[in-house]
């Protein structure tokens, strides 16, 4: 991905394309794949939220699931603490617009009654026109949104 930037406190991981954990979760929840796909996975019942800022300036997230430029949040998990292997997924199935995409993660809700910790580690995978990148980071409940990465499509 051209012009990729990485946020503070975020590690870039080598991508094992044989490891289909994130893809399996997206498929399990009925999520789509496409020209641009950003998926977030974590390992507890807390509610993390994926935020993707499109080149148009629109934000795709739980409160605006579709953008006018074709982006869609098609999987949003753990508003209620239903899964210990959650995933979220934002996708542009086709005709992804040119420009810069910025990706953030927010620790929205700590589900204390489910025995979850106040810190959650996550993995974020971006796929853009066939190029895959993976990032890991962690958030503490109460932190501001962590801007994980940005990338530019020509």
Predicted regions and their residues:
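Intrinsic-disorder/low-complexity signal
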Residues: 2, 6-154
């Amino acid at each position: 991905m051209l012009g990729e930037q990485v946020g503070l406190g975020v590690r870039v991981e080598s991508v094992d394309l044989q490891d289909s954990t994130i893809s399996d979760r997206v498929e399990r929840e009925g999520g789509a794949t496409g020209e641009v796909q950003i998926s977030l996975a974590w390992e507890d019942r807390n509610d993390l939220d994926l935020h993707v800022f499109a080149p148009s300036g629109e934000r795709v997230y739980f409160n605006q699931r579709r953008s006018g430029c074709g982006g869609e949040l098609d999987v949003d998990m753990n508003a209620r603490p239903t899964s210990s292997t959650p995933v979220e997924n934002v996708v542009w199935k086709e005709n992804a617009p040119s420009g810069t995409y910025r990706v953030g993660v927010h620790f929205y809700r700590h589900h204390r009654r489910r025995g979850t910790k106040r810190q959650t580690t996550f993995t974020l995978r971006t796929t853009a026109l066939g190029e895959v990148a993976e990032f890991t980071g962690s958030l503490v409940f109460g932190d501001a949104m962590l801007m994980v990465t940005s990338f530019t499509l020509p």
